[in-house]
């Protein structure tokens, strides 16, 4: 965004909101001269100042950068859903948007330019602000290796198509040969300017839960049967691989000890939690402890760059496998029954991804952990043989009570609050199912409505709380402050 366009926008918003220059300067904590300099286009506000401007005018960063400043841009009306293969992606952590996505983008760019001798990559938005913590720069260099690669972090640019935007340049003999503008939009999926991605193709006819449920009732089928009819019987081979990876991740996480990488000094807790059974432990306490241990195991493996499955993202990947494995062991469900539950969960995740977002950089942690909780509640509902109405209520309930949840990872690492949050969401998914057993008939809010609400809420969140590590715990935490 040009400096002068910043000035025009600020002046327009002042007029619309009836805020004087002096009052706005006080709100922002800057001088009137500084504000005037912005308005004239002589200087540009810092990223923190832009975040404060967004808060002052009740705008998201996206709307401030791209919109008129008067109303929210609407998400395009979707047409169907992608394959569930785009929901569950097997890869390495710690972040589907900050490691898996950039890795894919770099791989595509490298294949396009096999004969160059230098790459330059510029990270913008959340990729820049939390890229070091997530290891984005490391994965970029590793993927483009052995070609000489420099990575730059641009913290100021805001006129971006997505908060996770990166730009790549290829050189031969110091001459620019090619460039690419790309976005990592969550769950390991990417968009590239000027390139049609095969994975973006919709294969499901319906894009709302209402329509899917009506179709299932009309044809007397379960959601997983709708998946099988659409994807083909080989989808079970894919889901078998997904489930195997999920279980292996829990097993590895439970058996590994030590300190997680990144400098925050977080110790692994999954194995300790799993072994801490007490002689007077109630069945309910044991259930919570084991489910949490499984969720911690996945979260810790992800934080260490281990092999995980996005569900819907790396940062929220511990919720679904934790609950599925616990109930498989408790009730003896077959692998095929678990796979059917995973198919059901994937449809819920795709509905959120299509009609809202699963990206913490776009809509905060509600988009990641809230979606994971909803997916897990729906999967559990399928395992328990619940009705479509009960499954919908459980999934809706799971998202509703994560609305407004912030994404403010300390040091930009997927550790605090991310790992513990997976465990809490796993327990919440079970609570949502328990409520659905009794209260489904009295519900007033649909799953489609709560997904729409989540998207609007996410766009209203300050950029500080959308995976930029510039607000909340990420801002206030200091390693010298000890817990009493």
Listing of model-derived features with the role each one plays in the protein:
Residues 380-484:
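Functionally critical mobile loop/hinge segments
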Residues 18-37:
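Short alpha-helical DNA-recognition segment
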Residues 247-364, 472-484:
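Accessory "access/gating" subregions that flank catalytic or transport cores
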Residues 143, 149-281, 289-290:
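C-terminal regulatory domains involved in ligand/effector binding and gene-expression control
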Residues 118-154, 343-381, 388-394, 400-432:
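A structural-propensity feature for long, helix-poor, extended segments
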Residues 48-63:
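DNA major-groove recognition helix of helix-turn-helix/homeodomain DNA-binding modules
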Residues 1-17:
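A short, Lys/Arg-rich alpha-helix, primarily the initiator
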Residues 55, 65-78:
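Short, charged recognition helix plus adjacent turn
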């Amino acid at each position: 965004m040009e400096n002068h366009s910043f000035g025009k926008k600020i002046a327009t918003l002042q007029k619309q909101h009836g805020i004087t220059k002096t009052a706005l300067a006080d709100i922002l904590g800057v001088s009137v001269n500084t504000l005037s300099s912005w308005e004239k286009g002589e200087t540009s506000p810092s990223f923190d100042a832009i975040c404060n401007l967004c808060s002052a005018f009740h705008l998201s960063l996206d709307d401030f950068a791209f919109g008129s400043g008067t109303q929210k841009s609407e998400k395009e009306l979707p047409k169907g859903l992608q394959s569930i293969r785009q929901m569950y992606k097997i890869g390495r952590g710690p972040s589907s948007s900050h490691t898996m996505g950039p890795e894919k983008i770099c791989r595509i760019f490298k294949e396009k330019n096999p004969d160059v001798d230098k790459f330059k990559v510029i990270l913008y938005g959340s990729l820049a602000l939390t890229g070091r913590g997530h290891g984005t720069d490391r994965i970029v260099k590793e993927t483009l290796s052995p070609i000489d690669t420099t990575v730059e972090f641009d913290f100021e640019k805001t006129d971006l198509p997505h908060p996770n935007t990166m730009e790549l340049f290829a050189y031969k003999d110091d001459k620019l040969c090619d460039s690419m503008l790309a976005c990592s939009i969550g769950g390991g999926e990417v968009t590239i300017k000027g390139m049609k991605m095969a994975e973006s193709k919709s294969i499901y006819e319906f894009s709302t839960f209402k329509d899917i449920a009506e179709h299932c009732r009309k044809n007397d089928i379960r959601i997983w049967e709708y998946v099988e009819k659409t994807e083909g019987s080989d989808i079970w081979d894919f889901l078998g691989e997904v489930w195997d990876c999920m279980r292996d991740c829990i097993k590895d996480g439970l058996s590994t000890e030590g300190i997680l990488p990144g400098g925050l000094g977080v110790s692994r807790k999954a194995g300790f939690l799993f072994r801490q059974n007490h002689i007077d432990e109630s069945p309910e306490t044991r259930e919570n402890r084991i489910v949490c241990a499984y969720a911690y195991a996945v979260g810790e493996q992800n934080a260490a760059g281990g092999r995980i499955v996005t569900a819907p993202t790396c940062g929220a990947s511990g919720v679904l496998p934790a609950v599925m494995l616990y109930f498989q062991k408790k009730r003896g469900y077959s692998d095929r029954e678990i796979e059917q539950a995973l198919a059901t969960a994937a449809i819920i995740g795709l509905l959120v991804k299509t009609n809202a977002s699963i990206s913490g950089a776009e809509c905060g942690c509600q988009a990641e952990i809230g979606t994971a909780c909803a997916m897990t509640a729906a999967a559990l509902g399928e395992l328990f043989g619940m009705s479509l109405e009960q499954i919908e209520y459980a999934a809706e309930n799971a998202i509703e009570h994560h609305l407004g949840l912030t994404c403010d990872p300390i040091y930009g690492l997927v550790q605090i609050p991310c790992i513990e949050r997976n465990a809490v969401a796993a327990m919440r998914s079970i609570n949502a199912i328990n409520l659905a057993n009794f209260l489904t008939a009295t519900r007033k809010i649909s799953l489609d409505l709560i997904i729409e609400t989540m998207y609007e809420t996410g766009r209203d969140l300050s950029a500080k709380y959308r995976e930029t590590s510039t607000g909340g715990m990420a801002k206030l935490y200091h390693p010298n402050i000890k817990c009493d």
